[in-house]
Amino acid sequence: MARDEFPGWHGTTIIGVKKGGEVVIAGDGQVSLGQTVIKGTARKVRRLSPGGFDVVAGFAGSTADAFTLLERLEAKLEATPGQLARASVELAKDWRTDKYLQKLEAMLIVSDGKDIFVITGAGDVLEPEHDVTAIGSGGNYALAAARGMMDSPRSAEEVARDAMAIAADICVYTNGNLTVETISA
């Protein structure tokens, strides 16, 4: 089968919600190959602690590529302790300019409890305007749902869980088996 004909790994939904002095990153557990669900219990949200500095990261895209990027992010955080923004920018620069990294197909949401960023292979480090961001195939559904709940009395975790439930109901590449990590500044 030629590379262009390979159906590829599809879908996931990752959301980051900053509210009430904490950040919650949640992700579903579904991994699909074409129209087939391969696994329903994948962990796409991880807690990293390079040099004792806690960061939560969620990823969408190729798992192997995401792990490569998470390792690079950990190295950047060790080189710039406590400076998530700087480490994220350094990772994005490497990702955009390194010939090997340019081929990686993944996106990351990262947070240290104070800041939350989306890091892309295009060299972007984006901080959400409305304290909520989402990536992946169900990202737009989760983002819209969460934005509609941000003024409610729900906690960051409740907003994230409810938004993910809505995304899982709409997006066939997203399931309701969530991994949720909370981090405070």
Curated annotation (Swiss-Prot):
Taxonomic superkingdom: Bacteria
Keywords linked to the UniProt accession: Allosteric enzyme, Cytoplasm, Hydrolase, Metal-binding, Protease, Sodium, Threonine protease
GO cellular component, one term: proteasome core complex
Disulfide bonds: none
Activity regulation info: Allosterically activated by HslU binding.
Pfam families for this protein: Proteasome (PF00227)
GO terms for biological process, alphabetical: proteolysis involved in protein catabolic process
Keyword Zinc-finger: no
EC numbers, comma separated: 3.4.25.2
Family the UniProt entry places it in: Belongs to the peptidase T1B family. HslV subfamily.
Function description: Protease subunit of a proteasome-like degradation complex believed to be a general protein degrading machinery.
Assembly behavior: A double ring-shaped homohexamer of HslV is capped on each side by a ring-shaped HslU homohexamer. The assembly of the HslU/HslV complex is dependent on binding of ATP.
Protein name (record): ATP-dependent protease subunit HslV
